[in-house]
């Protein structure tokens, strides 16, 4: 399926679940980007998850997002439980605008959710010749050494910087040995995962 055709189909699905066309388009772009860069655990495999969260009212399809400008360099966004892609899109755009004006841009977002690849947003800033750092929290998924129960989030971190060439440096990772997206893909495709990256009831 061609990328444009796929995007149209994803937009239709999101609109069916109540997203505006603009928010559906932003979300579709992020999902397709994940597929194109090979991060399948953050691509189309997540589409059902987002739709389910809308149905369960975890995600607000019609959010009233509020942006508060703290200073010339800092903004705070209350995303009103919007789909994460929309909140992240607003956040990186605001950070870029601040940085271009004052040399640094900082944006904090609350009341949002899973937004896919941090690298997708870092790349947008790097294309504007900006160094970027993105941090987010996550629910418990990582067990401390010797434990069987999750305590820490994967808490993804992302760094991006121009390199002077067409290929920027972008590191999008988490504090866990493997991201949950890869575990999800392996489970769905009945594939084995490397030893030592996950725990069951026996350790």
Model-assigned labels for residue ranges:
Residues 1-6, 59-62, 196-203:
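Histone-fold modules and their flanking histone-like tails across chromatin and transcription assemblies
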Residues 1-17:
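Generic N-terminal amphipathic, Lys/Arg-enriched alpha-helix
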Residues 21-32:
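Short, well-structured alpha-helical segments
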Residues 22, 36-47:
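N-terminal amphipathic, basic helical "cap/leader" segment at the start of enzyme domains
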Residues 43-96:
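Active-site cofactor/substrate anionic-group-binding motifs, chiefly glycine-
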Residues 75-164:
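A generic, well-ordered mixed alpha/beta core segment in the N-terminal half of proteins
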Residues 142-203:
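Phosphate/diphosphate-binding glycine-rich loops and adjacent basic-rich segments that engage nucleotide
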């Amino acid at each position: 399926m061609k990328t444009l055709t796929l995007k149209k189909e994803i937009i239709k699905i999101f609109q069916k679940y109540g997203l505006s066309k603009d928010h559906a388009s932003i979300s579709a772009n992020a999902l397709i980007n994940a597929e194109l860069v090979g991060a399948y655990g953050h691509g189309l495999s997540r589409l059902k998850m987002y739709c389910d969260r809308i149905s369960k009212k975890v995600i607000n399809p019609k959010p009233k997002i509020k942006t508060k400008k703290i200073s010339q360099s800092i903004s705070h966004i209350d995303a009103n439980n919007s789909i994460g892609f929309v909140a992240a899109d607003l956040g990186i755009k605001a950070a870029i605008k601040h940085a271009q004006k004052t040399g640094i841009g900082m944006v904090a977002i609350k009341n949002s959710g899973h937004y896919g690849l941090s690298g997708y947003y870092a790349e947008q800033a790097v294309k504007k010749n900006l160094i970027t750092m993105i941090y987010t929290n996550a629910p418990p998924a990582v067990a401390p050494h010797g434990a069987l129960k999750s305590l820490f989030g994967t808490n993804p971190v992302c760094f991006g910087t121009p390199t002077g060439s067409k290929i920027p440096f972008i590191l999008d990772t988490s504090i866990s040995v493997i991201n949950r997206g890869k575990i999800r893909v392996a489970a769905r495709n009945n594939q084995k995962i490397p030893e030592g990256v996950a725990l069951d009831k026996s350790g």
